[in-house]
Amino acid sequence: MPEAKMTAQRPIDTAAWKALEAHYEKIKNTHLRQLFADDPQRGTRLTAEGAGLYLDYSKNRVTDETMSLLVQLARERGVEERRDAMFRGEKINITEKRAVQHVALRAPRGTKIIVDGKDVVADVHAVLDQMAAFSNRVRSGEWKGHTGKRIKNVINVGIGGSYLGPEMAYIALRDFSDPAMTFRFVANVDGAAFTDATHDLNADETLFILSSKTFTTLETMTNAATARKWVVDSLKSEAAVAKHFVAVSTNAEGVSKFGIDTANMFGFWDWVGGRYSMDSAIGLSTMIAVGPKNYEEMLAGFHDMDEHFRTTPLEKNLPALMGLLTVWYNNFFGAQTVGIMPYSDNMKRFPAYLQQLQMESNGKHVDLEGNHVDWQTGPIIWGEPGTDGQHSFYQLIHQGTKLIPCDFIAFLQPLSPLTVMHDYLTANVFAQAEALAFGKTADELKAEGSPDFQTPFRVCEGNRPTNTILVDKLTPRALGTMVALYEHNVFTQGAVWNIDSFDQWGVELGKVLAKRIIPELESAAAPALKHDSSTNTLIGRYRKALGRKN
């Protein structure tokens, strides 16, 4: 496949960008109170639906003209053409000369997507079939550990996308998980993480999934070696490794040397970035937890949103609209962050998952031509589940000096039988979005009898923008839909900003430096340090604390 052709024009030089700059000056002080007063139908008109999700974007600081100009910007920047190039399997990851085919991971059986002359969908389903067969063996008890006991505990060992996605999905879908099994996740190279995950488990009932494409990732392989020693020491046999470890990797030689039968190695491809891989073999722990049928439902949800993004006009395209609104606040209002507020305790790790997805994708300072950008790119992503966050950081959103656009995610049907609590939870979603939009004026407070000296402190200015996303119920299908919503949201932003959303060279630099420093910390003899004076001093203090020579 040829590489996708992209316009070299800088986004800030487009007609739409210049029009948006002028438009911003015109409406920057317009209040949402006025926008709603002028248009009684705004709350139903500025909405969009697709793939089972309902997006209310009416509480954004936009007019019809704003949205028209944002869509014009997307078209001038070739968002639709770049989207289509991705779905065709073209190499839109230009720095690594790779296709970007996470959409192939959930393409229905029989679909054809050609990358480098090969139908990758057939390969995807071959791995899915392998995963399903293995998952069924573990779930049924057919797969037994070294001593003949069935597996009751599964520990996923990975880092970044090999960890955040599986952990987020397991917690989100725990109501669909096998209650007889325990699932845990180890990522941090801090030994406390491994100890916490294993302290109350029996090795003869525990299966480790080692997730590393190269089987060389420092954190993952350090934890893998620790896990191997734990199993071998507990079960007094090297042969136990083959029954208590499987791998998600492409390094058959490394997997075999570790002691894992390569028949129990689940592969994936270089056209899938780690942060886009939770629905690849990286999701093996998810499939074991919820079962192959529920995993298929999750993939169907991903595909539902893929098709919505691929076929829906930008004016009603959920991920495109959300991405363009992020551009609006990031580049015209100067907002530096986006808050992600899921009102579901099961979605507590969703903000952390989106941190990697968005910040690793769009945290870039050069454009596709290699030139330093003269415009802001990816915002900081953060958040907590509601209502927890209301009692910690919402105060700053309501009355602070920072503009923080927020996404509120609400589920209409509860998973818990405690429906009264769900009513309270949902009331808080709607109340927070309303309060942020409209605030409370001094006149309103005085009419309610607020003491004069207190009134200035109690005023909430409002005009804080939010999206509200309504989901029927937190099911495997809905989770897939929501993840794909944000994947394509990120894509839209990156295409507008003219950056490569699919590489991560900044991450690589830190890995290289860490490999250099490790032997300098470990050596018995005093190392010849050649870092800057700060790093040399820090290394020296560490060595001194551990009684090593300097």
What are these regions (language model features)?
Residues 2-37, 41-78, 320-332, 347, ...:
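Flexible, glycine-rich loop/tail regions that form catalytic "lids" or insertion modules at the edges
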Residues 11-16, 23-24, 28-35, 41-147, ...:
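Extended, charge-enriched "interface" segments that sit outside catalytic cores
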Residues 58, 376, 380-473:
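Helicase-primase coupling helices
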Residues 122-144, 169-171, 175-204:
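Glycine-rich oxoanion-binding loops at beta->alpha junctions
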Residues 153-155, 207, 246, 339:
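Conserved beta-strand elements of the Class I
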Residues 164-179, 200-202, 224-232, 259-265:
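A glycine- and small-aliphatic-rich helix-loop capping segment at beta-alpha/alpha-beta transitions
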Residues 223, 230-419, 439, 511-515, ...:
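Active-site phosphate/pyrophosphate-binding segments
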Residues 461-464, 468-497, 502, 509, ...:
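C-terminal accessory domains/tails appended to large, multi-domain proteins
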